[in-house]
Amino acid sequence: IIIATIKSWNIENAKILQKQHLGIHEIKIIDNKEEFVLEKIKSFQPDIIFIPHWSYIIPKEIYENYKCVVFHMTDLPFGRGGSPLQNLIVRGYKETKISAIKVTKEIDAGPIYLKECLDLSGSAEDIFKRASDVIFSKMIPKFLLEDIVPCEQDGDIVSFKRRTPAESELKEEMDMETISDYIR
């Protein structure tokens, strides 16, 4: 098993998972882009690669040769694309689902293995940490215990664009709740 992530809260949870599965599963943690290359992946020969938070394009030669599962913070096919948390908050959502999907050529369009609910209250960091806890305590363990068959995404596709700093500028006409959502 490989876990590829760049966020500290995911790295911490991956290390906990490593300890919990010592002697059961060999888990390698990759926390930088330079290590996430085919040659290094080949040397480890993983059965599955989990990608809980990765800000880079996943190389085609990796997802075509290995089972790669990415975790996306929307109820797909709603919310494909960049800045999912920020886009949900700006649209007033109070909860979402984390979708575990098969990595394919098209971003966030792969078949869905499973989904879990996620509360969007608190700061962005609180939400990311809560998402990490859901991924590592509920979702990844299901993969390790069951043979989950993914299903094609069903429903209307709604795509998000990566938000820019200019889109997060405060405006005079905003009410307090909107301002709170912009700065959390």
Language-model segment annotations:
Residues 1-184:
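One-carbon transfer enzymes
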